[in-house]
Amino acid sequence: MIRNFRRRKFCRFTLEKINNIDYKDIILLKNYITENGKIVPSRITGTRARYQRQLSRAVKRARYLSLLPYTDHHR
């Protein structure tokens, strides 16, 4: 019987002891956005629920202030 072994994902923000996610930190936010501009879910990234909420809020603020694009491909 073959079992799928999945590596445990760790929350980067918990390990680095980051309390608040800043919307002006574009380099950090780009790691959690797909090529199309969607926010990557926590089941893929491994972030905890608290930080995922902060992350989505920060991405939405950065989009509103034109620091991040809503989508990459405009046609």
Curated annotation (Swiss-Prot):
GO molecular function ontology, one term from the record: structural constituent of ribosome
Record-linked Pfam families: Ribosomal_S18
Organism per entry: Wigglesworthia glossinidia brevipalpis
InterPro entries: Ribosomal_bS18 (IPR001648), Ribosomal_bS18_CS (IPR018275), Ribosomal_bS18_sf (IPR036870)
Protein name, entry field: Small ribosomal subunit protein bS18
Stretch forming the signal peptide: none
Keyword terms: Ribonucleoprotein, Ribosomal protein, RNA-binding, rRNA-binding
GO biological process, one term: translation
Family: Belongs to the bacterial ribosomal protein bS18 family.
Coiled coil segments of this chain: none
GO cellular component: cytosolic small ribosomal subunit
Subunit-level organization: Part of the 30S ribosomal subunit. Forms a tight heterodimer with protein bS6.
